[in-house]
Amino acid sequence: MKHIRISLFLCLLFILNAFHVFAQSSGASQTENYFGLLKNKRVAVVANPTSVVGKAHLVDTLITSGIQVVKIFAPEHGFRGEAGNGDHVSNGFDKKTKLPIFSLYGSHTRPTPEMLSNVDVIVFDIQDVGVRFYTFLATMQEVMEAAVISKKEIIVLDRPNPNGYYIDGPVMTDPKLYSFVGQLPIPIVHGCTLGELAKMINGEGWLSGKKSCELTVIPCSAYTHNSYFELPIKPSPNLPNMTSIYAYPSLCLFEGTCISIGRGTNLPFQQFGFPNCKRGETSFTPKEIPGVSTNPPFENQLCKGIKVSFEERPTQMNLSWLMTMYSSYPNKEKFFSSPGFFDKLAGNSLLRKQIAKGISEDEIRATWQKDLNSYKVIRQKYLLYPDFN
């Protein structure tokens, strides 16, 4: 009887959790809250494969509802997700709608005044993962800059943040390191949705000249920062599941090192290591995968290392992975293969130096706290949803 009660409890817990996940709804799904704002206007849409309303793409939904969509802007990986990590995204036309597509991840990272000359309002709808160096945040910031320059409205259709239940990592404090993987004074795991960050960017004067754009955010429904949210569509080619999304804040720092994080395998951002690694029990051989991974580290070489798994959602970045790989790698001088890029990901040059000096994790984290506390005060002003505990 005891086992039956436990089983019933677990079933009930599963049903309640499933209902909560199902009940959450993106800003894009709240069509009654923004269709009226688009009526009789020429609309540009910043979107990718995650931009869905139910099972239909946002662009298709707008067109079938009589909204005049005149063009599409595509972020990293492209409008239909056809480009790999870091690959140049080209201009073109969408085969289904015949609409022109302008790349925001190539020769231009923001719409030009010419591109916006026949546009009244920009709609931004992209799923983010809540990490500073995920480039969709920089794309949104650049679109906001363009909206200021061209005096256009921007509507952000908000989406839940799967990593929005905690805040961690160093705050980006050195403007000299600003790049497309980080150009805001926020921590690596910022605990905000893109809608909240858009309000923060506007409110804190982080756009050029401390100007602000004409911004409307359409919030999600039934979402809190404690909510569990499982992404229905992978946000980018190398983040195929929730394990990779939870590991991403920690493992992406390895992109500035020589360590493989599983790019070119069936478990990207779910395993890491190098040839002849003495730590961990997993093994993998990175290979080129068209549209997903080009020239991955240690291509066609057998790597050994650690496979990532989570019994529960992580509540902080895992610095021990980075420290373990550094201590295990035989040639310390070559570990940080791209030190400048590592610093851009970290937001400062201090973390790299701390790892090299063997500073403890507690000591490293202590150096983050002052800036984190200041950020948390700013963040509270722009929250659209109940916060995590």
Located regions from the model:
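Conserved anion/nucleotide-ligand pocket segment
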Residues: 177-248
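Glycine-rich oxoanion-binding loops at beta->alpha junctions
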Residues: 90-119, 131
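Glycine/threonine-rich flexible loop motifs
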Residues: 128-140
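Short internal beta-strands
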Residues: 70-77, 157
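Glycine-rich, charge-decorated loop segments at or immediately adjacent to ligand/cofactor-binding or catalytic sites
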Residues: 81-86, 155-178
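Glycine-rich, aromatic-lined ligand/substrate-binding cores of catalytic
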Residues: 221-299
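Conserved functional hotspot residues or short segments at active or partner-binding sites
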Residues: 268, 272-369, 387
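Bacterial Sec-dependent N-terminal signal peptides
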Residues: 1-26
